[in-house]
């Protein structure tokens, strides 16, 4: 499947900046990946002494394979990059556009457990304006990968800068990491905040303060 122009531009921008998720070119189709994941997941679950003949577990390897390829790791395939609607800013709108409390669910690439939180994104329109729902979809696309929050924040920033043809973009993410909450230190109350600021959001203290203050 040919990639969209938007997907090609965003991927190239991330590669240029060293912000792309570490991944190899895929040599398998989606169905081939599911078959191979299912096979290896059967081995893993068997090694954990689970009885896959039980009707509750029999389909678990296939369910996991489908979930990985079609859902929680679907952002590894740029063929799934959202269809983007960007229009010329003919109205000359030049005030901050903000989308707040975007639901965010990702997966920690170190332990493959959940990252759960929200994102707030703002930009100052220059030449282009993007459909608001597309911002949510871009966040979701990059969240549907094994991730670290710092990279995810930067990836969303660069994607929007590329598509909007402006550096004036800001991204803030607040998330709970289940690799901290459900294992290891088992801290159930802490959360992690990351920001990525570009253009005027980085260079102008007043604009930066306005974004960060309203994002609390």
Swiss-Prot record:
This protein's name: GTP cyclohydrolase 1
Top-level enzyme category: hydrolase
Entry binding sites for Zn(2+): 108, 111, 179
Species: Shewanella baltica (strain OS155 / ATCC BAA-1091)
Membership in a protein family: Belongs to the GTP cyclohydrolase I family.
Entry annotated with the keyword Zinc: yes
Catalytic activity: GTP + H2O = 7,8-dihydroneopterin 3'-triphosphate + formate + H(+)
Gene Ontology molecular function: GTP binding; GTP cyclohydrolase I activity; zinc ion binding
């Amino acid at each position: 499947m040919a990639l969209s122009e938007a997907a090609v531009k965003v991927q190239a921008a991330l590669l240029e900046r060293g912000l792309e998720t570490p991944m190899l070119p895929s040599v398998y189709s989606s169905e081939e990946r599911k078959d191979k994941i299912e096979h290896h997941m059967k081995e893993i679950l068997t090694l954990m002494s689970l009885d896959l003949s039980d009707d509750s577990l029999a389909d678990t390897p296939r369910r996991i394979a489908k979930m990985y390829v079609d859902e929680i790791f679907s952002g590894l395939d740029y063929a799934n990059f959202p269809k983007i609607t960007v229009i010329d800013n003919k109205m000359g709108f030049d005030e901050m556009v903000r989308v707040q409390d975007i639901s965010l669910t990702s997966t920690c690439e170190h332990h493959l457990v959940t990252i759960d939180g929200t994102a707030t994104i703002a930009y100052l329109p220059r030449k282009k304006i993007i459909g608001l729902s597309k911002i949510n979809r871009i966040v979701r696309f990059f969240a549907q990968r094994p991730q670290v929050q710092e990279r995810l924040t930067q990836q969303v920033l660069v994607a929007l800068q590329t598509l909007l043809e402006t550096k004036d973009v800001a991204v803030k993410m607040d998330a709970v990491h289940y690799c901290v909450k459900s294992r290891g230190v088992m801290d159930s109350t802490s959360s992690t905040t990351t920001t990525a600021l570009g253009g005027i959001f980085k260079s102008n203290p007043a604009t930066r303060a306005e974004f960060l203050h309203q994002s609390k």
